[in-house]
Amino acid sequence: MALRRLSKSVSSAIKAQYTLSRPSPLLRSRSLSSSPHYTSIGRPTNSFIGKINNSSITHATTTHGQLFPLSSPRRFCTTTAQVNQNEFTEMAWEGLINAFDAARESKQQIVESEHLMKALLEQKDGMARKIFTKAGIDNSSVLQATDLFISKQPTVSDASGQRLGSSLSVILENAKRHKKDMLDSYVSVEHFLLAYYSDTRFGQEFFRDMKLDIQVLKDAIKDVRGDQRVTDRNPESKYQALEKYGNDLTEMARRGKLDPVIGRDDEIRRCIQILCRRTKNNPVIIGEPGVGKTAIAEGLAQRIVRGDVPEPLMNRKLISLDMGSLLAGAKFRGDFEERLKAVMKEVSASNGQTILFIDEIHTVVGAGAMDGAMDASNLLKPMLGRGELRCIGATTLTEYRKYIEKDPALERRFQQVLCVQPSVEDTISILRGLRERYELHHGVTISDSALVSAAVLADRYITERFLPDKAIDLVDEAGAKLKMEITSKPTELDGIDRAVIKLEMEKLSLKNDTDKASKERLQKIENDLSTLKQKQKELNVQWEKEKSLMTKIRSFKEEIDRVNLEIESAEREYDLNRAAELKYGTLLSLQRQLEEAEKNLTNFRQFGQSLLREVVTDLDIAEIVSKWTGIPLSNLQQSEREKLVMLEEVLHHRVIGQDMAVKSVADAIRRSRAGLSDPNRPIASFMFMGPTGVGKTELAKALAGYLFNTENAIVRVDMSEYMEKHSVSRLVGAPPGYVGYEEGGQLTEVVRRRPYSVVLFDEIEKAHPDVFNILLQLLDDGRITDSQGRTVSFKNCVVIMTSNIGSHHILETLRNNEDSKEAVYEIMKRQVVELARQNFRPEFMNRIDEYIVFQPLDSNEISKIVELQMRRVKNSLEQKKIKLQYTKEAVDLLAQLGFDPNYGARPVKRVIQQMVENEIAVGILKGDFAEEDTVLVDVDHLASDNKLVIKKLESNASAEEMAA
């Protein structure tokens, strides 16, 4: 039944008058003229107060319990009980209104006390349910008994004209009496429950059957209400405030719900020391996200449960306050403050037995403050300063500086406990302590090598997060991945299932064919199906057996974990008989069963290949890191080993010539993949110098293509865009107050999202000198701090800078020197590097790993480049289903036309575009070349100037035949 809110303008005038057709003994015992609750019936004006059973309710009276509007004719009436909605709490009034609905659903006209009880019990999170639970009464049995009583009452076919029963009238009057006795301002649900002891129709016999004494009920009400009084229409929000808005960490530790806390002894001891102070006994744990601030509070809770704390903290409760729950649902001004005051009152009333833990404590600054109201921090300050409220806070360094330090009055009430990131060795210890929990959750076994690998790889490659959180996440995700594989169908079995389905479909399509070939194919399919189905059956049996054995092992481990918790609980309570029975009886039996199940699984796997894998290894951890960062960290397979050894050949597929440059780059990659490079610097840093068009940028693209299987993974920064002083800041981000501050730097943002990449600074000599100040830190420490203070790691990048400095020296040296190629290269390199030293500052040059000088291309290398470009044209035409063939003479002619030592290989591309691609494009548009045609590129030997000729190749003729 919907209960409509009253508008403020008419709420003060809302009343419902009920005429009692048969006054109760309680009413008869009073003088009607002197009772303030009764008045003779007048004719008050109608005021809308809500709806009952979809009928509008106004000021009304009842004749024999029937509700009538006051304006309607009344045949008789005796007395009138005035019931004002504003005298009831929201939950009590809602229960009263819903009682009419309960009666209507039961097809009963008279609304009695049992209908009110049913309505109160059906309220979600209602007070009646909480009180009965505290009294040790099962709510479902109470509701069942109420329904049984209601079902025995007479029913009518039409329950629209509902009447108010005398028993409910008695409940209403007695509830008001209990309200006065308890010094409350409003009638609440607990007053209704106490009034049932005066109800001779239903309540007295009902509570007697439930064996619920009135004193037990009063004690339960006191437990739920505490010291709170009903002073507003929504008092339930202040009852059991700590239980409603907090989580008891000590109780969770007692039940084994918290993860074990390894280490952090100094921080926990410091917190205990601060908590034992007389005033300002409030530690605040400060540290980066993920270093274990909340774990310190959980570790303290576990110590309290074990009794491993000083006397002032023995048997204390540590409650984690949920600020979100405090704020949620606080619709009106003052609701939040009342809830928080109720929490503080409960903590203060516990006389130091309760310690609050507020995670993300910076949220209390400004929480609940609106329209000039005080925020939560101002409500907490007085009690924090006097030592009446012991509170542990936790927040990050940034948020502490941003929120807490700006309020000195709040800051001085807290004592800082700094929580630093643990070392890799400490992280490994933490992971070993957590291993059992994650093994139990995922049903897998986690090897020690996986834990070590998680700590080491997380520290090196996941740079923007902190230990131990990132290492724990790696182990958790690797366990989840393996669990997914265990619960899913094995790859081998899944492949067979798909093959069977494919053959079944093929069999159906061939079933009606009568030719010999189809029958032979059908027979072959049936034979294959028979073999596959037999193998499928065997694998299914093996899979189910393996899965059942692994499930049994997991259930034994869970049972052992539960028994260990019971042993700890018994030892804490000094129930030594129970502890001995569990430890030397139940636990030993379970351990024997676990060993037997593990032995059965091992024996089963000895007879065939295992379909399921249950051990998380360092390979799994490396695979997860690779997926997170894009860094290829999985163990080197034999194919990749061979590929690394032959890396020069791989790069030479795209870069023609430049043997010295390719070898230097390949050596750097091999060092990195073998784990020999300096972990605190970029993988390698090169300066490529040489004439234009000799392959400097192409080598960088080829390297990116090898590392990522796509050359788009290269981070290319064209330094000609950074020639002005004001443009330099774009690399790391605009300073505060400038446009683009929130967007970050054009270099740093890309590398943050793709930490393993080839960073190419193209034409570095064109950059403004201030750019080199930024590059110094990048080349030396492998990191840059952007404009927002974030540290961006370049430790997994290959940094390449290209420059055209000294290109004229290179050309002159090659023209005028007759020595060997190696000797000429050394002379040329010395000259170019010396020229670079004159153009760049010494501190910049000193940080580059290697200077690589590219040589001009000769005619043979240009011919190879022509072949590369022609293969590119051929691949483009194949997409249009047109084949391309070319003769050696055509390649030589194109190389001759495109060769210019001063410009490198770029003229080749222009020549091929003009003489080959343009002609073929015109032929396609004219219709000379269509699909399935073969286009021949050849030299016209009959012409005096050996022109290039492009024509359609006749079928069954090769390029060599046409050339002949």
Curated annotation (Swiss-Prot):
In residue numbers, the region (Repeat 1) covers 88-153
Do you know what upregulates this one? By heat stress.
* Residue ranges of every copy of the Clp R domain listed in the record: 83-227
| GO annotations of cellular component type | chloroplast; chloroplast envelope; chloroplast stroma; mitochondrion
Spell out the residue ranges making up region: I: 242-490
Q: Would I find Metal-binding among this entry's keywords?
A: no
Region feature (II):
616-807
The terms under GO molecular function for this entry are:
ATP binding; ATP hydrolysis activity
Q: Which UniProt keywords apply?
A: ATP-binding, Chaperone, Mitochondrion, Nucleotide-binding, Repeat, Transit peptide
Instruction: Report residue spans for region: Repeat 2.
Output: 164-227
Name of the protein described by the UniProt record = Chaperone protein ClpB4, mitochondrial
